[in-house]
């Protein structure tokens, strides 16, 4: 496994990481098998954005006694309400959900505290000027989080974050298909079944984000590296050609400022395929 500096955070992360979303559909034994395989492959960074209680607890059990070998990326604003995930900026919901994450993971700190899922420019400004960001900064001052990050699918929001002087790293969606598209505040745009035929090359909105992040030393961890798996099938890929996990990971790792691709794994075999 190779490792890269995550921007100016001082953290060294594995080029391939664990995006733990798919673990939500597995029991504790299966989660532990995947995480053990990740450790054996030298993976040292995981993202847990999910609010579902069981998956948080199962990850906590799997890393028990080994917390220090993991760089954990956890999220502010991902909550579990009435049996379902809700993204919110309501501080009465945000605070207990964040405390629940720490408790279930069995840790008293996160390496990367992420402002969760900000795709609208107006919302970015509201967050940064309000109680939500004040709470995030308070957690950093207390040492509960070591660095402040933000997750977005919108390159224009990413640029705002990278230039803010407050955000230290980004979780951003990168794959060969998404890079063709202009900025959008609607995530569904990126999963359209067909792309317009005139699209070609990296869209300027996204090229600018990569340039700004490199200039500002804002490291990027990558989500949606496989476009939710659609790039693996010629039928669902906008290129009408099936790509492999290794091809998708290589693509993301060659973008400026990218430090780690957080792939999703259902099984240890998926981990091995990503690291091939």
What are the language-model segments listed below?
Residues 1-74, 108, 141:
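N-terminal binding-site loop/beta-alpha segment at the start of enzyme catalytic domains
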Residues 7-23, 73-86, 114-117, 226-230:
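N-terminal small/glycine-rich loop or linker at the start of catalytic domains
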Residues 17-29, 79-95, 121, 125, ...:
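Active-site mouth loops of central-metabolism enzymes
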Residues 25-38, 89-106, 152-160, 243-251:
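Short, acidic/polar
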Residues 5, 13-17, 44-45, 69-73, ...:
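Structural preference for beta-strand elements that scaffold enzyme active sites
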Residues 100-124:
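Active-site groove signature of glycoside hydrolases
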Residues 37, 41, 105, 165, ...:
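Structural motif
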Residues 118-276:
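Beta/alpha (TIM)-barrel catalytic core signal, keyed to glycine-rich beta->alpha loops juxtaposed to Asp/Glu
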């Amino acid at each position: 496994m190779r490792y890269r500096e995550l921007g100016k955070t001082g953290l060294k992360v594995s080029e391939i990481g664990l995006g733990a979303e798919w673990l939500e559909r597995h029991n504790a034994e299966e989660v532990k098998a995947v995480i053990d395989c990740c450790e054996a492959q030298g993976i040292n960074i995981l993202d847990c954005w999910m609010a579902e209680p069981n998956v948080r607890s199962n990850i906590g059990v799997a890393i028990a006694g080994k917390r220090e070998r993991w760089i954990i990326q956890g999220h502010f604003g991902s909550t579990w309400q009435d049996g379902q995930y809700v993204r919110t900026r309501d501080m009465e919901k945000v605070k207990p959900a964040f405390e629940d994450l720490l408790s279930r993971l069995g840790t008293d700190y996160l390496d990367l505290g992420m402002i969760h899922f900000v795709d609208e420019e107006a919302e970015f400004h509201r967050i940064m000027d309000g109680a939500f960001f004040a709470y995030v900064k308070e957690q950093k001052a207390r040492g509960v989080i070591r660095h402040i990050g933000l997750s977005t699918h919108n390159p224009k929001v990413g640029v705002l974050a990278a230039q803010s002087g407050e955000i230290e790293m980004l979780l951003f969606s990168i794959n060969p298909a998404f890079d063709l598209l202009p900025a959008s505040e609607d995530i569904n745009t990126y999963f359209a079944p067909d792309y317009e035929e005139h699209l070609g090359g990296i869209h300027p909105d996204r090229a600018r984000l990569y340039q700004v992040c490199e200039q500002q030393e804002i490291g990027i961890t990558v989500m949606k590296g496989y476009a939710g798996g659609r790039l693996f099938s010629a039928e669902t890929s906008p290129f009408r050609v099936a790509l492999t996990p290794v091809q998708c990971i290589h693509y993301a790792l060659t973008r400026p400022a990218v430090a780690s691709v957080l792939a999703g794994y259902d099984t240890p075999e998926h981990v091995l395929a990503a690291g091939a």
